[in-house]
Amino acid sequence: GLHKLKIKCPMPIKNKKGSYLFKIKKKQACIVTFLDGKDKSELTAKDCYVVGKNIGKLHKASKKLKIFRKNSMSINSWGPLLNKIDNRINKVSKNLKNSMKHDLNDIKQKWPKNLPKGIIHGDLFIDNIFFYKRKFLGYIDFYFSCNDFLAYELAICINALCFKKTNSSFIFDKKKSTNLIRGYESVRKLNGNEKKYFNVLCRGSALRYLLTRAYDYLNTPKNAIIKIKDPKEYIKKLNFHRQVKSYNNYIN
C-alpha cells in the first residue's frame, strides 16, 4: 500500500486470520499502526507548502497501486443528497435550498470530464494532518479515499485549509493557497485544463461539504456524541468561489 511507497501514513496490519479487512458488529474494520504527533489548530503558509508537496507525493506514488474505488461523494451524489434536505434548512440561511439547487445546476454544466485522475485522500481537513515538533508527520483517516480528479483534492484543501476565521467570517488566505499549490507543483505540475477548471472544482468541493453539513444539521440527533458542524462556514466559502472566476485568483 501507500506506506510501502514511502507515503507518510499509518500502515494496515493483518488480523490473526491473515485479513486486512474484517467485520466488527457487522461493520467493516481494519487495524492500522499508530501515527505519532497530532493535528495543529491552524496551519502556517509554510505548513501549506509542505502539505501540498506531500499531496503531490501521494498522487505520484498511488499511480503504482492497481486498486479502484468510486467516489461515493462525487458530483453524481449531490443531487440525491439535496433532495433529502428539506426546507427547514432555510432557517440556517434564507432561501438556502434554492441557492444550493442553483449552484448544483451551474456546477454540473461546467464540471470537467477529462482531467487527470488517480487515488486521492478525499478528506484532507486539518485534523487529518499530523505534525510532531512542528514537522509534518503524515496523514490519517482514509475513509473517503477514492479515485477522482487529482486537482479536486487540491480544491478540497483550498476550502479546508486556506480560509482564516475572523469572528463569523471566513477570509480567503491567498498566501496559504499559493503555498499549497506551489508545494504540490514541486512534485506534480497542474496542466492547462486543471487550471482552467480550478474554480469550478473549488465551487464543487464547497458545495459538497455544504450539502453534507446541511444534511447532518437536520438529521443528527441533538444528543449525538458527534459535534454537528455549522453549514454557514461553507455558505461563506461558496460565496467566495462564486465571485472569482480564474485560477489566478488562487495563486500569486
Residue locations for each model-derived region?
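Structured catalytic core of nucleotide-sugar glycosyltransferases
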Residues: L5, C9-I13, S19-F22, C30, ...
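Active-site acidic catalytic loop and adjacent metal/ATP-binding pocket
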Residues: P12, N105-Y152
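A glycine-centered beta->alpha junction motif in the catalytic cores
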Residues: A29-E42, N83-N87, L207-A224
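A cross-family kinase active-site recognition segment
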Residues: E42-N95, K117, I225
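Active-site activation/catalytic loop segments of kinase-like enzymes and analogous catalytic loops
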Residues: A151-K189, G204-P221
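All-alpha amphipathic helical-bundle segments outside canonical DNA-binding/catalytic cores
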Residues: G192-C202
